Amino acid sequence: VVAEISGNHEGELAKALKLVDAAASAGADAVKMQLYRPGDLTADVPTWKVRGGPWDGATLWQLYERAQTPVEWMPELFAAARARGLVPFASVFAPWAVEALEKLDAPAYKIASLELGERALIACAAHTGKLVLMSTGRATLGTVNDAVESCGPTPHVLLHCVASYPAPLEQTHLRTLTHLRTLFGDPVGLSDHGCKPSAVCAAIALGARVWEAHLMLPRPNRALDAGHSLEPEEFKEMVAIIRECEASLGVSRFGLGDLPAERDTDSFCRRVVYAADLPDGHVLRPRDTVRLRAPEGWPADVPLPLGRTLAHGVPAFAPIQLEDFR
């Protein structure tokens, strides 16, 4: 479970640290930042504006300038995360970010959906030998394949993602997880912009082993990604649901399990008993037996002692036993 801080710190280190603390309290395993400078992504051109969505009308430069997490914050954020038992890492958008995070011994790197075509960046992150997580929103299958090739032998996780903020449930297309597993193997995961419990449970059932979602401080606030983020209590509830889903998967098994309640159903199993009163000296025939739910009787999957002679009379519905025969 990865809690994504993104730009929800509103440009304040104190809020970023509160988000780290909230991630730990909510039960996340890891917390993720984003490390870039606006110039890594765009240029300060007044006509380069966002069209539609929650940031409609802002220039790209304005958006990324507001959302950035300064590199100077990273040592304190990483230390705070580790102190709370979280795994800290970040999305990177340029090689310098990888170099900066290597100095903090970052255990993993994330490649955002819109950077999946940046093969040199992926190779730079993969060259560290650390785990590389890659979101696939908007990416064609060819782009995903190229990204995986760019990782080489470095361990990686593909995160199915819908590049909509938020992502409608009916457009989540979780069967993509099965496709990714078939083509590229495990593990896979979900970078979630919809945050619906039903979708998360379905993703886990389909093989997702990583779930990432945006975390924000309690409303009201001016969090940049508020439209597709969870408050701490909402995130905590989702983590609880995820843990239940994980527990319910169990293993593939058949037959009787270890639960006492399962063993209590033993008396309901079908067994073979005598179908009628039978006298001493009777030779047992198939029609003399019947399979019924009974607490005692001849095991239904064991061949009957047909043709054997009774050593004594037996009543109807008595359990068939070897000692009944000569």
What are these regions (language model features)?
Residues 1-326:
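Catalytic cores and adjacent flexible loops of soluble metabolic enzymes
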